[in-house]
Amino acid sequence: MGNRSMGREDTLGVLPSLLFCKMLRFLKRPLVVTIDINLNLVALTVLGLLTRLWQLSYPRAVVFDEVYYGQYISFYMKRVFFLDDSGPPFGHMLLALGGWLGGFDGNFLWNRIGAEYSSNVPVWSLRLLPALAGALSVPMAYQIVLELHFSHCTAMGAALLMLIENALITQSRLMLLESILIFFNLLAVLSYLKFFNSQTHSPFSVHWWLWLMLTGVSCSCAVGIKYMGIFTYLLVLSIAAVHAWHLIGDQTLSNICVLSHLLARAVALLVVPVFLYLLFFYVHLMLLYRSGPHDQIMSSAFQASLEGGLARITQGQPLEVAFGSQVTLKSVSGKPLPCWLHSHKNTYPMIYENGRGSSHQQQVTCYPFKDINNWWIVKDPGRHQLVVNNPPRPVRHGDIVQLVHGMTTRLLNTHDVAAPLSPHSQEVSCYIDYNISMPAQNLWKLDIVNRESNQDTWKTILSEVRFVHVNTSAILKLSGAHLPDWGFRQLEVVGEKLSLGPHESMVWNVEEHRYGRGHEQKERELELHSPTQHDISRNLSFMARFSELQWKMLTLKNEDLEHQYSSTPLEWLTLDTNIAYWLHPRTSAQIHLLGNIVIWTSASLATVAYTLLFFWYLLRRRRNICDLPEDAWSHWVLAGALCIGGWALNYLPFFLMERMLFLYHYLPALTFQILLLPIVMQHASDHLCRSQLQRNVFSALVVAWYSSACHVSNMLRPLTYGDTSLSPGELRALRWKDSWDILIRKY
C-alpha cells in the first residue's frame, strides 16, 4: 500500500514538469498566421475611396435633387410623415442615417437649388453613405468579373472603368440614391455568382448559405431603395430559375437533395426579400409617427393614426354613426385632390355655357379644404328630428338615410337632370322646393363596401361607404372635373348610373363626427363648431397602413411632365444629354452629370459586338461547329446573361414609362455594360486574334484606348468635382456636342 501511494505521488509530480516541457517546446516554434491579401482589391478600394471622398463637403450648397432628399431627411429627423412616390423608404432611411450620425437636427430650409448650407448641416455625413457605396462598387466590379472566370487583367479593366467614369463619380459624391442602388445591384450579382460557384464543391456549407442569403438580402435592399432595383432582382431570379431547372435534371442528386436545394432558394430569394421589404416599411412608419404636409393624400383612417393633425382633430369622436349624427364625408379616391362633400347657398346656373339647362338647385361639390359647409346630418327618413336618440341608434349596411346639409338644412338630392360637366351622369344638388313639378328624390341606401357582414354598423373613419340613390340607383360619385367660376372651381359631384363596380371615386368615409343634440338650427350651428366628447381608439394595423401607403406610392402621379434637363432613353446611349447640377454663385465653377464619352460609346459598341458574336456562335453550334471549348462557352453565355440581361432589364423598360426621365436613370444599366466591355476585349484577344503578333497589336490598342478614357476623364474633371473655375473659352472647348448644356457666365 505504501509503495502504491509513493507511485501516485511520483506521477503527480512528473505531470506538471512534462506539461511545462511541452509548453517550452511549443514556444520555441514560431507562431505563424497566414493571411491572403489581394493587393488588387486593396488598391482598388483605396482609389475608390479617394475619388469619392475627396473634398466631399464641397460644394457646401444644395446640389440638384439634394433639395428633395434633404427635405425627407429633415422629416426623418423630426419624425414627420411624408410620402415620396419615387421609391420605397430604405434609401431615404440610409441617407437619414448619415444625417443622424452627423448630429443633424433637421432644421434647414430646403427651398432651392444652390442655397448655402448652414453650419448645423453635416454635409460630409449626409453625403458619406452614397460616396462609400460608390467607392465599394469599384472593387466589387473586379470580383464579379473574376467570379465569371475571366482573367485578373480583365477584372482590373472593369474596375478601373468604374473608377474613372465621370458620371458615376459625380452621382456618388452627392446626397442621392443611384450609387447606393448600384452598390446593392452589384452585391446581389456578386453574391449569387459566389453562391453558384460554391455549388459544385460545397453545397449547403456555411459559405454556400452565406452567399445565398446575402443574394436575397441584396435584392431586397436594391428594391427597397428604388423601384428600379426590381429589374436586377428579376435578373437574378431568372438566372437562378435556369440553374434550378438544370439542377432538377441532374440524375446524380436524390429527390430529397433536389427538394432541399429548391426550398433553400425559395426561402432566400423569395421569402427573405419580401420579409425585408415589409421590414423597411415597418421601420419607416415607426419612425414617422407625427402628422406632416402629405397627410391629406392618405385616407382618414391613416391620418388618424398619426400624432397631431387629424388625430388631434378626431380625438374623442364617437365610433358608430347613428341617426342624427353630424358628419363630414371625405372622398376615398383623393384624386385629383383630397376633398369633402360640400354645399353652399349658391345654385346651379339656369343655363350652362353650352346651352343646356339645369335644375337651378343648390350646388353640391367636393371641396378640398376644411370648411363649416362640409358638415352633413344623417337623418332617419321616418323621423323629423335631427338629433341622436339616447341610446343612439346606429346606422347599418343597407339602411335608407337622408343627408341634410348642416348649414342650409337642405337634403342631398339627385334626379334625371344631366350634371353640369358630365352630361352622361346625373346632377347632384340640395333640393329647393320651387313649387314646380319636380319632386324631391332624397333617399339614399347605405352600402358599406368593406363590411364584414350585412349587419355591420357605419363606423367613423374605418367604414368605406357608397350612397346608392333609391329612385334611380345612381351612386354618389366624385367626377374629378373642376367646375367653372360659378362653382368656385370646386370639384364636380355627380350621380353615376353606369357603374360597373365600387370605384374609389364612388367611395366615401366619415372623417369628423359628433352626436347631434340641438333641436333648433342655431343650436345645431353651435354644435358644428364645438369639439367632440367621446374617445375612441383607431390604431390601424401595420399591414393596413403598409397596403395603403404602397398603393398611394404606386398610383400617385407627378403632373410635371417636362423639365429643362429631362431626356429620352435614346439620348442616353450616345450621351447626347447632360444635367447641370450646380453653378458657383460668383465664379464659373460648376458640376455636371456628364459621362465619359469614350467609355459610354465603347460600352454600347461592346454590347452590339457581344450580341453579334453570340448569335454567330449559336448558329455555328447548331451546325455542330464549336468555336469555343465548353468551359469557355458556358462562361461566355453566363457573362452575357448577366451583363446584357442586366443592361436590357435596367434600360428597355424606360421606353414604356410615361414619366420624366433623366440621364441618371441610365447609370444602373451602364454599370452592366462596363462589366461587359473588358470581357469582350479579353474574348477578342483569346479567341479572335489568331497569332501572337495580332494579340500584341490588339493589347497595344487596348492600352491606347484605356489611356484615352483616362485622358477624357481628366479633361472632364472640373465638371465632375466643380472645384475649378474655367474661362468661357475653356468651357466652350469642353462642349463636345451641341446638345450639351455647359453654363457660361456673361460678364
UniProtKB/Swiss-Prot annotation:
Residues 318-381, 392-449, 453-513 form the MIR domain. It is a multi-pass membrane protein. It catalyses: a di-trans,poly-cis-dolichyl beta-D-mannosyl phosphate + L-seryl-[protein] = 3-O-(alpha-D-mannosyl)-L-seryl-[protein] + a di-trans,poly-cis-dolichyl phosphate + H(+); a di-trans,poly-cis-dolichyl beta-D-mannosyl phosphate + L-threonyl-[protein] = 3-O-(alpha-D-mannosyl)-L-threonyl-[protein] + a di-trans,poly-cis-dolichyl phosphate + H(+). Pathway: Protein modification; protein glycosylation. Gene3D superfamilies: 2.80.10.50. It is an enzyme of class 2 (transferase). The keyword Glycosyltransferase applies. InterPro entries: GlyclTrfase_39-like (IPR027005), Glyco_trans_39/83 (IPR003342), MIR_dom_sf (IPR036300), MIR_motif (IPR016093), PMT_4TMC (IPR032421). Its EC number is 2.4.1.109. The keyword Glycoprotein applies. Belongs to the glycosyltransferase 39 family. Transfers mannosyl residues to the hydroxyl group of serine or threonine residues. Coexpression of both POMT1 and POMT2 is necessary for enzyme activity, expression of either POMT1 or POMT2 alone is insufficient. Essentially dedicated to O-mannosylation of alpha-DAG1 and few other proteins but not of cadherins and protocaherins. This is Protein O-mannosyl-transferase 1. It comes from Rattus norvegicus (Rat). The gene is Pomt1.
